[in-house]
Amino acid sequence: MGFTLHSVYFTLKVSLLLGSLLGLSLGLEFMGIPNQWTRFLRWDASTRSELSFQFKTNVSAGLLLYFDDGGVCDFLCLSLVDGRIQLQFSVDCAETTVITDKQVNDSNWHFLMVSRNHLRTVLVLDGEAKPGEVRPQRQYMNIVSDLFVGGVPSYIRPAALTLDGVLSEPPFQGFILNLKYGNSEPQLLGSQGVRLEMEGLCTENPCENGGTCFLLDGEPRCDCSATGYTGKLCSEDVNHIPGLSHLMMSEQGRSKARDENMATFRGSEYLCYDLSQNPIQSSSDEITLSFKTWQRNGLILHTGKSADYVNLALKDGAVSLVINLGSGAFEAIVEPVNGKFNDNAWHDVKVTRNLRQHSGIGHAMVNKLHCLVTISVDGILTTTGYTQEDYTMLGSDDFFYVGGSPSTADLPGSPVSNNFMGCLKEVVYKNNDIRLELSRLARIGDTKMKIYGEVKFVCENVATLDPISFETPEAYISLPKWNTKRMGSISFDFRTTEPNGLILFTHGKPQERKDARSQKNTKVDFFAVELLDGNLYLLLDMGSGTIKVKATQKKANDGEWYHVDIQRDGRSGTISVNSRRTPFTASGESEILDLEGDMYLGGLPENRAGLILPTELWTAMLNYGYVGCIRDLFIDGRSKNIRQLAEAQNAAGVKSSCSRLSTKQCDSYPCKNNAVCKDGWNRFICDCTGTGYWGRTCEREASILSYDGSMYMKIIMPMVMHTEAEDVSFRFMSQRAYGLLMATTSRDSADTLRLELDGGRVKLMVNLDCIRINCNASKGPETLYAGQKLNDNEWHTVRVVRRGKSLKLMVDDDVAEGTMVGDHTRLEFHNIETGIMTEKRYISVIPSSFIGHLQSLMFNGMLYIDLCKNGDIDYCELKARFGLRNIIADPVTFKTKSSYLSLATLQAYTSMHLFFQFKTTSADGFILFNSGDGNDFIAVELVKGYIHYVFDLGNGPNVIKGNSDRPLNDNQWHNVVITRDNSNTHSLKVDTKMVTQVINGAKNLDLKGDLYIAGLAQGMYSNLPKLVASRDGFQGCLASVDLNGRLPDLINDALHRSGQIERGCEGPSTTCQEDSCANQGICNQQWEGFTCDCSMTSYSGSQCNDPGATYIFGKSGGLILYTWPANDRPSTRTDRLAVGFSTTVKDGILVRIDSAPGLGDFLQLHIEQGKIGVVFNIGTVDISIKEESTPVNDGKYHVVRFTRNGGNATLQVDSWPVNEHYPTGNTDSERFQMVKQKIPFKYNRPVEEWLQEKGRQLTIFNTQAQIAIGGKDRGRLFQGQLSGLYYNGLKVLNMAAENNPNIKINGSVRLVGEVPSILGTTPTTSVPPEMSTTVMETTTTMATTTTRKNRSPPSIQTTDDIVSSAECSSDDEDFIDCEPSTGKSGGELVIPLLVEDPLDIPPIATRAPFITLPPTFRPLLTIIETTKDSLSMTSEAGLPCLSDQGSDGCDDDGLVISGYGSGETFDSNLPPTDDEDFYTTFSLVTDKSLSTSIFEGGYKAHAPKWESKDFRPNKVSETGRTTTTSLSPELIRSTASSSTGMVPKLPAGKMNNRELKPQPDIVLLPLPTAYELDSTKLKSPLITSPMFRNVPTANPTEPGIRRVPGASEVVRESSSTTGMVVGIVAAAALCILILLYAMYKYRNRDEGSYQVDETRNYISNSAQSNGTLMKEKQQSSKSGHKKQKNKDKEYYV
């Protein structure tokens, strides 16, 4: 088609070669067969040249043409790839590729041109240009080979070809016509497999008068440009016009080729012909011309003014015609089918207008005269239309403009604002009267023709206005000052897919103007164009206020080209986008736009010190640079070569081409750290918000600032800022519910944009201070809330987006939106502040300080925290600390438990948010208390190492207990958050564990009086409300105290202070270190220091580095014999034995422990054949464990440690590997098989399940009677040294040295040195001296078992419980029911002393691997003796009560909730009931505590004295134990404790006013309920870990299962008579019958079942509190398919 030819209309020179040479004007057909090719003479494209041809094809792949430098570096290859044209070229080994967007395998003709210009090569397909550029060192291309078209000959060596694989390219299939090197035809050197097409069409030249024949789309055409003739065959004569001599042609000239009348225009040149002397009046006329250009827009020709004109222009690559004869414009657009007319090829344009009679429909239209207008381009494309009928004459007495005008934008009807750039030829206007050859008149210099600019009358290549791409938002270029005053125009094209960007901006000189604030304000004239949210806006201020004009109705960021044309005349003007015009009128009266300085295109410079940015220009405020393409920039009709400007300025991020990548950039997932990827213009955009990272791919970790309530970061802006749009984002983490996050502040106004935590929510407040500037005042600050419970110490992301009056607040996924009231939208600020608001002059209520962490603060594109840290800005005032630090704000130490202070009343009427941090080694203590009106109160206390939150809102007291994994008195900082919202939902969060409870009824907390911190005044403890357990103050550190948004200074704000209170928190003066305790002693941290537990070391002293009591046994043998009193014989399930020794004997007994006569249980430590070993028997067979590896009779000092737990045992010498023993077999199952046939069938299954759940051998070492040391009584004499003997809390050698009456020494035994002093003057007791600070707890358990599947083992003990009595001295403990003794000696209650090992013991696999192993406890057992005298004494004296009720009955006031750390809550208002299920729901414990201490006096173990003051809290357990407790009245009385140092007593309390039912005087084993498994498998308990380093203890017996060792268990018995013992032994023979009787009896007894929570093993009590009796019950799982419940009860009294 004609519009796709290059240089074929006017400058075509055809030379047909005869003989062997054939011009390509005849065309070539390529068949696509292998080894096809055509070869043309070398194309000299080294620097500047053009190559063009036409082609058509229907295949998608093939080689079009190729040449290279002979295999070195340079080449050029044109090929078909996937139906598109691909250009590859290389210069000096710098290679690039260009691919067209358009597919060409459509069997249509296409025009292709390759233009070379040094390092730049442009591929033009049907008018669409695709440039490619390389940047090598060499500036030209080396060319050696000829040009190959359609394929490369196979005989060429591959090494001689530069491009690898070019020989394997598929051959081209299709047609190629008119191959040209510039304007000349190349010489064909040879071909193979190519057919000549259309021969003979131009052989006989059909053109007359010297016209030149050429082929166009396969058909012959004539070029008449050089003949003086016109027409299809150059046969039409040019009209001779008499009277106009300057237009007449002589007859002689008709047959000669006339000189070409052409000229080159470069955008600022134009021709002007004056018509004032010969005005035009015509009804029919014709305009003809030819043009050639790369430019898309430009004025070609114009004549006329106002409403009578003709305008011909190029608009977006199409030919535009506008004619107005006075009654309205006729507009026509001619576009090619493919491509554009700006393809740098010649195109012919012809416009005709003829008067015609037009018959229309209706009488009004009949026989009317109209002007028929026809426009054609290249003789093919034609558009026809009619002008309005009222006027038919064109009258013009103005000028004829060719190629441009002084002000193209101001010409009437002009669709473009810029002049033409390119070549124009033979511009002719003619009508019935005249013929104006305007091009020739200009060339010959006619007087009426004025030439403006340097017009050259030849056709030269006009440099294309190449598009440029802004690849980053920071990229920009500077343009010269825009000299516009009263009028001006700007036009450009843009193309992008990004929604926001500043395209143009320039402003004038600053002018001081006064605004409504009566203060000077700098204002400037400015002009700007911006893209915001996909819409194009024009902003203009000419001194009287800014106008903002939206120029698009739909979003323009769709990746297509948009043409923008802005024309201004005075105050008014238009902006058109793709011909859609929008008028505008500037504010005020001024018609002058006073600009100064550069105009910025694409963005703004980083240094904006000299710029005054208007607040209305949101993209500038938000730092949105433009990313996309710009082309064809014309200012006042003159082009701006922005490519050259970018290269001259070396503009970073600006590329001199525009191509859109076909692939989406986010498909490769470039964004890291879970950032959101968005596709931009040829780039990906990683949104790092909320990730904690920054950078192009969010690869750099953002800096974190830590704030402690006194810290802040303040950004002081270099100048006062005014904005109407803000983007704010950051992350924060805090445990406080209140605190300032970020705020903008002003020194001159109350303007602020403030974000703060308010009640656990983020509050956004925007105040624009309308009052001071006399604007339309709003109703006050705009406020939005988002998020909830954000004080959870987790990262949360906050984003704020404001656009004028529109507000949006986003917190994580919660979104709140609002619209501001009033007309004022400008925010003024001098500072951006975080943490603390320092600018307070205009703030009525100062927000609370922030305690927490802040990260990634971005305000309008500026990442201020990182900019401040890196020193990129120098206006940063920083008081916060970098890094994710542990924040301890304003710590205060309460050095004693009697220290406290009081503050003003806590204001928490409707809601409450409390936060504090604490650190202590004390297990108990008051932290916070405030009483109120009526019964209202709030208390926070530490009970047994767990936080209790107790409160009463008028409905009765309630308690919520923290469910921490471990006690909190571990000398570590812990965080506590307590909240109460408007719905009366209370929550307690300790570190990461939260408990929540909804309270019905009253919702308001009416507090009065002082708020007490860390304790109470003397006398207040006796009047505390229900459920408050503490009776002493808090000893330790408090920090970061937040009282419902108020951060008090605990010392300065205190109304009253008492005791030792100091700032800071140094903690214990000495702390446990690795070497604090020698010889593997265990270090126990205390607040005032630490203590060492040397029990299992054989050493003594404060740091376990002093030798223990040492005896030397001579050659003749000796014996040290310790005998338990008859009423004080313990039975144990676990034992621990340690002793140091040195010897050279090969055989001897070191220590032997025997049970009462007739029982046969024993434990013996001996040396056999020089090796140490232990043998023990606990009722079945002898069990032996030995150190086989190394003899110990080497005369060196060794320490041996032995532990037993049931049948499991460990033995370790020094630090050698541990020897372990795990027995096999199950005696219970064997005995069950013996008696199975005697059990009724229906009971077989329950009994079998019961035995399987028990799953243990005999595990109890019964009725221990004596300890023999030295082996003389057995004839196996020990000779050598024994030191520091320890057995289950007894240090026998120390006792022997102190002449304990229960010890006898015989034979050759000699004490070495003096007995080590224990705690100075305190004599040695059965309580080890290192345990003087241990916490004692009384635990009495009752357990009833319902036989059912999936239940924990009913009879497996894992803790130090009361196990047996002297009345049950049989080995068949599991089958014998024993009655309690009624003898004079009475019963005795055993008190286990628990000390936790601070070391973590590695877990050992069990049958229940998903259970967390409980922590280490070190029980030390003593007794509370009860005799008839003591019972009567307590009966007469009454039971002690510590509540304000005195000693009258110890009613409800003595009740507290148990289950410390369980997270459960209890409502005191539940009605009393006799239903046992009620007590399975709650775990209760009385608040009457047993005071315990070390013994005073000698070793009278059965009559200890107790002093609570001598005990200090130890590091308590990580996991507690919940047991179910029930005591008979007799037992309660027998265990009552008085505070007078007489016989220890246990309290008697009521369970919520429910009286206890009479029970037998018995104590039952607890039921472990820590896990449940299939009942068909043996159940195993959770075993506690040992108290000492590297010394494992043994687990209860279970075949093949190795467990974490357990703590020792000791029980002591009352005395028994010999007859009773004989009777019990005889009763053993009847065990089977008794078992059947017991099973039958208790199976048919309907009793409630109770589960024991094994996760709460013995929570240690405070040293100052009265040892609490635990009576906790938990919900049992009831069998749904059995009506009767099988009970198994073991009585060990």
Curated annotation (Swiss-Prot):
Q: Which GO terms describe its cellular component?
A: membrane
Q: What is its main location?
A: membrane
| Binding-site list for Ca(2+) | 308, 325, 393
Coiled-coil zones = none
Q: Where is the EGF-like domain?
A: 198-235, 662-699, 1068-1105
One GO MF term on file is: metal ion binding
Q: Which InterPro entries match?
A: ConA-like_dom_sf, EGF-like_dom, EGF-type_Asp/Asn_hydroxyl_site, Laminin_G, Neurexin-like, Neurexin-related_CASP
Enumerate the spans annotated as Laminin G-like domain: 28-207, 260-459, 466-658, 704-876, 890-1065, 1109-1309
Its tissue distribution reads: Brain and arteries (at protein level).
Q: Which residues lie on this side of the membrane: Cytoplasmic?
A: 1640-1693
Keywords attached to this entry: Calcium, Cell adhesion, Disulfide bond, EGF-like domain, Glycoprotein, Membrane, Metal-binding, Repeat, Signal, Transmembrane, Transmembrane helix
Disulfide linkage: 202-213, 207-222, 224-234, 423-459, 629-658, 666-677, 671-686, 688-698, 1037-1065, 1072-1083, 1077-1092, 1094-1104
Please report the record's description of how this protein sits within the membrane.
Single-pass type I membrane protein
The region called Disordered is annotated at 1535-1554, 1661-1693
The family this protein is said to belong to: Belongs to the neurexin family.
- What's the protein called, per UniProt? Neurexin-3
Q: What is the native source organism of this protein?
A: Gallus gallus
